[in-house]
């Protein structure tokens, strides 16, 4: 699918060539949510499903799913332009969609909503927004101080230290390397397939079917990551044990002092590997990139993932909102 015209608004394909355009708008924002980067959106979008337009001097990112348009981010631009852009984006979505029920804007940062509330100049448009739209808190991003993840001090990190020590004792010949998209591609895809197989073994059939649908998207994301690894300025580590790749992690810098983890996988059978590679990645980010905080994204609503992310004692939780129409 090429470009799309909806309600006289041309929507262009969201491709790798969109990177400098989107990043021009992102660079003017002060936001530490993991969703507000080009790479985080590009690698997860299925082929041909992403579109963008510059509306009211704002970058507007849309996704087409099952014929319905939604927005992956709010309009990116100056505060004075964002409200009108949002209203126009809903008009575009409504013109395309089978029902206004499907029109929504995901991953809205709290600061954008607070700006609407606090600005006297926007009082009229804020009233209009409250009259016509619903704002719902969805997920939170988990943000950690990097020094805490490296040092793992105190009783709250006792289990993490124990797991890492057991790993180092069991696998003293481990090898850590910076991720190379050519050298490590085959090993990472093999590990990913094993990871999927190990997970499915212990799942009820119905749950496994839903899980495998999501895995198709994640496999596509990893392939996109390899295809444009250097171009996307991604940062990664891999770990080898006895010549086999047993773990990898990939992230990127999202601001001067904050980095994010996009994808991480380790072999379930290698106990302590996940904790170890997370600490080593934290070390690399601090030593080579001067990073002070790591954002590991949200828990996607999964309780087990929430427990794991809370167990690392986040420095802060950053809320994300979805805007619907009434």
Positions of the model-derived regions?
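Amide-forming acyltransferase catalytic core, primarily the GNAT-like/NAT-type
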Residues: 2-57
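A residue-level signal for conserved active-site and pocket-lining positions in enzyme catalytic cores
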Residues: 22, 167, 309
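Conserved donor-binding loop and adjoining core beta-sheet/short helix segment
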Residues: 37-116, 240-269
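Short catalytic-loop micro-motif centered on adjacent basic/acidic residues
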Residues: 103-104, 175-177, 292-296
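Conserved active-site alpha-helix within GNAT-family acetyltransferase domains
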Residues: 112-133, 162, 300-317
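Acyltransferase donor/substrate-recognition loop-hinge adjacent to the catalytic core
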Residues: 125-208
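Short, conserved active-site entrance elements at the starts or edges of catalytic domains
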Residues: 184-244
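Aromatic (often tryptophan-rich) hydrophobic motifs at membrane interfaces
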Residues: 233-326
């Amino acid at each position: 699918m090429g470009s799309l015209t909806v309600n006289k608004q041309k929507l262009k394909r969201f491709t790798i060539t969109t990177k400098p355009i989107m990043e021009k708008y992102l660079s003017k924002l002060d936001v530490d949510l993991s969703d507000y980067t080009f790479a985080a959106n590009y690698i997860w979008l299925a082929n041909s499903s992403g579109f963008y337009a510059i509306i009211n001097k704002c970058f507007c990112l849309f996704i087409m799913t099952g014929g319905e348009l939604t927005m992956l981010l709010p309009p990116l631009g100056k505060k004075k332009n964002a409200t009108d852009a949002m209203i126009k984006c809903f008009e575009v979505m409504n013109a395309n969609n089978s029902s206004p029920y499907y029109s929504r804007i995901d991953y809205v940062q709290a600061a954008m909503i607070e700006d609407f509330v606090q600005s006297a100049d926007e009082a009229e448009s804020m009233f209009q927004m409250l009259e016509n739209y619903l704002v719902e808190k969805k997920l939170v991003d988990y943000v950690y101080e990097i020094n805490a993840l490296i040092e793992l001090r105190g009783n709250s990190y006792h289990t993490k230290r124990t797991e890492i020590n057991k790993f180092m004792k069991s696998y003293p010949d481990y090898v850590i390397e910076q991720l190379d998209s050519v050298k490590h591609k085959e090993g990472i895809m093999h590990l990913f397939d094993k990871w999927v197989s190990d997970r499915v073994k212990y799942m009820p059939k119905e749950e496994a079917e839903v899980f495998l649908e999501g895995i198709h998207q994640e496999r596509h994301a990893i392939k996109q990551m390899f295809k444009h690894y250097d171009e996307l300025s991604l940062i990664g580590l891999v770990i080898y044990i006895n010549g086999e790749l047993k773990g990898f992690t990939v992230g990127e810098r999202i601001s001067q002092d904050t980095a994010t983890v996009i994808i991480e996988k380790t072999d379930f059978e290698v106990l302590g590997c996940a904790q170890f590679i997370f600490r080593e990645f934290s070390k690399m980010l601090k030593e080579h990139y001067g990073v002070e905080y790591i954002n590991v994204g949200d828990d996607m609503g999964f309780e087990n993932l929430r427990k794991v992310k809370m167990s690392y004692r986040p420095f802060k939780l950053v809320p994300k909102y979805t805007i619907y129409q009434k």
